[in-house]
From Swiss-Prot:
One of its GO terms (molecular function) is transaminase activity. Its main location: cytoplasm. Keywords: Cytoplasm, Isomerase, Porphyrin biosynthesis, Pyridoxal phosphate. This is Glutamate-1-semialdehyde 2,1-aminomutase. Belongs to the class-III pyridoxal-phosphate-dependent aminotransferase family. HemL subfamily. It comes from Streptococcus sanguinis (strain SK36). Pathway: Porphyrin-containing compound metabolism; protoporphyrin-IX biosynthesis; 5-aminolevulinate from L-glutamyl-tRNA(Glu): step 2/2. It is found in: Cytoplasm. One of its GO terms (cellular component) is cytoplasm.
Length: 432
């Protein structure tokens, strides 16, 4: 495929933005080459500035569960735009979205709309510290909760793609309040609470981790977190910025039938607009300003256009439609497993709901150490081969892929055919 114009745009972008991008993973550093510059998107497809079309499994990193430019959402968004793009005041549209979220997640007795997943997670941590009067937080190695200083300790995802354990610019005093433990390790968790339990404000968890590749938590691990946080008076926060309304119709909390104290949402609830939320039990959330002394604010929080996009997206995402998207995910993943077996390729294919990923690994991947040990060079080669065939996957083995209602069976079969061609070529290369 020709990429002349993408390369030209990338040259210009590097004069303006660090690395030529406005989010690091878009730079394609983990897979080689230059990023694609996208001109438009519709349904399951991206169209780049060179006129190439790609079947898209990145879907803006998860939000576009109905596909790009969904016809059942855009008319309401256009109407909202003409009624005013930002009020800086409450509107009925934020109530409509909040009620729909609460209907699906009843334990979210109170919530606050914000503009990004990072804003949601950092605010939830502030609530936990304000409520408990404690300073330490527990996170898990490889889980990414945004780029707030407290979270950039063994954070996986973008940092891992660049071989960075922690970010420069995070002062030691802040990093020292974050206790980073191995994912899916109940013994390490128990030991941590025995040592620091009275100082721990909260445990924050990606119950379906999507930033060290797709790695679901063990049910026993989640149950242990819930019991220890209750025993020690710490809050349990589930970060569902990625998995919310993706891993299950009710997100990871629905998948595992657990009830955290606070939850963070994002991506899908904005329908492609910058929307996120944090919320949970009223006893905690009612301590947020203006009712309480835990401060959080945002000029564009509850933006009426973004609220409309989120509302219309969730309204369309019925249990029946979710099941259809989940079935498509299973169909594709079953096909990948069959192809890996056919070509004797050690591939661990993982899916939860409408999310999927895979690792070039001989054994199941349960934590960040397993993920790092997977063959990332093979993934980079595969990514390049698939891109040439018009298949757009997340450009890092540490990232997760997504399915939408817009993907057709023909799209899935074309994708599997491209995988087969790539596997065959990789096998021939390996055999010399």
């Amino acid at each position: 495929m020709k990429r002349e114009h993408s390369n030209q745009y990338f040259t210009e972008a590097q004069k303006l933005f660090p690395g030529g991008v406005n989010s690091p993973v878009r730079a394609f550093k983990a897979v080689g080459g230059h990023p694609l510059f996208i001109e438009k998107a519709s349904g399951a497809y991206l169209h780049d500035v060179d006129g190439n079309r790609y079947i898209d499994y990145v879907l803006s990193w998860g939000p576009m569960i109905l596909g790009h430019a969904p016809k059942d959402v855009l008319p309401a968004v256009e109407e909202a735009i003409w009624e005013g793009t930002s009020f800086g005041a409450p509107s009925p549209r934020e109530i409509a979205l909040g009620q729909l979220v609460q209907e699906r997640l009843p334990f979210m007795e109170r919530m606050r709309m914000v503009n990004s997943g990072t804003e949601a997670t950092m605010s939830a941590i502030r609530v936990a510290r304000g409520v408990t009067k404690r300073s330490k937080i527990v996170k898990f190695i490889g889980c990414y909760h945004g780029h707030s200083d407290s979270f950039l300790v063994q954070a996986g995802s973008g940092l891992a793609s660049f071989g960075i354990a922690d970010s420069a610019g995070v002062i030691a005093q802040v990093a020292g309040e974050t206790l980073a433990l191995p994912y899916n390790d109940t013994d390490a968790l128990k030991t941590c609470f025995e040592k620091y339990g009275d100082d721990i404000a909260c445990v924050i968890l990606e119950a379906v981790a999507g930033n060290m590749g797709l790695i679901p938590a063990d049910a026993d691990f989640i149950n242990t977190i819930r019991s220890l946080t209750q025993e020690y008076g710490s809050l349990f926060i589930v970060d569902e910025v990625m998995s919310g309304f993706r891993a299950h119709y009710q997100g990871a909390v629905g998948l595992y039938q657990t009830e955290p104290d606070l939850v963070c949402l994002g991506k899908v609830i904005g329908g492609g607009f910058p929307v996120a939320a944090f919320g949970g039990k009223a006893v905690y959330m009612d301590q947020v300003a203006p009712l309480g002394s835990i401060y959080q604010a945002g000029t564009l929080s509850g933006n009426p256009v973004a609220m409309t996009a989120g509302y219309e997206t969730l309204k369309q995402l019925t249990p029946e439609l979710f099941a259809e998207i989940e079935e498509k995910t299973s169909y594709l993943c079953d096909g990948l497993r069959s192809l890996a077996d056919k070509y004797s390729i050690s591939l661990q294919v993982v899916s939860k709901g409408t999310m999927f990923g895979f690792f070039f690994s001989q054994k199941p991947v349960r934590n960040f150490e397993d993920s790092k040990a997977a063959d990332h060079a093979q993934f980079a080669r595969l990514h390049g081969l698939l891109l040439e065939e018009g298949i757009y996957l997340a450009p890092s083995q540490y990232e997760t892929n997504f399915m939408s209602s817009a993907h057709t069976r023909a799209d899935l079969d074309q994708t599997l055919a491209a995988f087969e061609q790539a596997f065959q070529e990789m096998k021939e290369e390996a055999n010399g």
